[in-house]
Regions:
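All-alpha prenyltransferase/terpene-synthase fold signal
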Residues: 1-365
Length: 365
């Protein structure tokens, strides 16, 4: 409650809660429902992953192919380690621990109720018959695909879970395979959209890695490319919650892609606080290098986040008049604004700007 009071968006959320607005009620309904269902999703994920790992007679080849396909040997595991890691992860309790670690992500937890709501809204709009199995498969598949970014980021960033990075390298190809097989249950157009989005996300990841190596080469164009890792993953998931059918596929894509980029800005601010350094690459780093003023850089990052959110809101004006879950989406965007405002206010309160400036000067040499 104190966190909500600390931002204007949070106060607006509290006001809607007191008035029991339609958006608040819809959002709360899905939040409570998915909190109850999340453990079931996690269990399905663990079981599918365990089955895939134990059944693979050539894990070395699987891991090499994944690293080659992604275009990053940093994601590969030394051949001599593969069998030991497979033996460790074949223990279902150990595997469950690793899955829980990568599912312990605000990004994953924020998207689970959203995808459920979008899928239901699209099903109602198109008059689809009820298929719980298909619904679970499409939603689970996209959550798992989004979750793949967690171990990949931890491997590349090397800023948390250092003792588990080999386990994550082993798990990655199986996570992707499970996501694909589940998403395919939505039909060929859904799988095709996913593959196109995943290709774009890989480009974003590749640019991210290049900029980590040469931070001083950052510019607005390669930052926009880097943000494909948010835009493509979230936008594609939004598109496929409508099973890639217009008009909702395009509308959901716009809203979720831009909301994902907006959250990316907030995530960069949160990471700066937690890691006591400006993230490389990030919008704060880009603005700091060009203004020479770290505090101003974070102000501009917040301005950038508002531009992304304004674009996301265009999707609301595109929705069909009879779309029942528009208030849910309006409330969702309010929570996104609160998230960014909260971490920006926390940064200003702590004011680590001089320390950040020294570290940027060292990194950008």
């Amino acid at each position: 409650m104190e966190a909500l009071r600390s931002t204007q968006a949070g106060k607006d959320i509290m006001k809607q809660g007191l008035l029991r607005s339609k958006g608040y009620r819809q959002f709360n309904q899905y939040k409570e429902k998915t909190e109850q269902e999340f453990s079931g999703f996690a269990q399905r994920f663990v079981m599918s992953l365990h089955k895939a790992i134990t059944a693979d007679s050539n894990p070395t080849g699987t891991i090499k192919k994944f690293a080659d396909d992604i275009g990053s040997q940093e994601l590969a595991l030394p051949d001599g380690s593969v069998q030991d890691v497979k033996t460790r992860l074949s223990n279902s309790d150990v595997l469950e621990d690793r899955v829980k670690r990568i599912l312990d992500s605000n990004f994953v937890k924020m998207t689970f109720p959203v995808f459920n709501a979008l899928y239901d809204g699209a099903s109602e709009y198109f008059g689809d018959g009820t298929s719980e199995e298909k619904r679970n498969a499409v939603i689970d598949g996209h959550i798992i695909a989004i979750d793949l970014s967690e171990p990949m980021d931890r491997i590349v960033d090397k800023d948390e879970d250092l003792e588990y990075l080999d386990d994550y390298k082993f798990m990655n190809p199986y996570i992707l395979s499970i996501a694909r097989s589940k998403i395919a249950q939505g039909g060929d157009p859904v799988l095709k959209a996913f593959e196109e989005g995943f290709k774009d996300a890989r480009i974003g990841q590749y640019v991210d890695v290049k900029l980590k190596i040469k931070p001083a080469s950052i510019n607005d164009e390669n930052m926009a490319e880097c943000y494909k890792k948010y835009r493509a993953v979230m936008g594609t998931a939004g598109r496929n919650m409508a099973l890639n059918r217009r008009p909702l596929s395009d509308i959901f894509h716009l809203g979720m892609a831009k909301a994902g980029e907006c959250v990316g800005c907030g995530n960069e601010i949160e990471d700066a606080i937690k890691n006591n350094a400006v993230k490389v690459p990030s919008w704060p780093l880009y603005y700091a290098l060009n203004t020479g003023d770290v505090r101003r850089a974070f102000e501009l990052t917040m301005a950038k986040s508002e531009l992304y959110l304004d674009e996301a809101k265009i999707a609301l004006h595109m929705l069909p008049k009879n779309f029942q879950l528009k208030p849910f989406l309006e409330f969702l965007f309010l929570t996104v604004r609160h998230y960014n405002q909260y971490w920006y206010n926390e940064l200003v309160r702590r004011a680590p700007f001089a320390d950040f400036q020294r570290k940027i000067e060292a990194v950008a040499k």
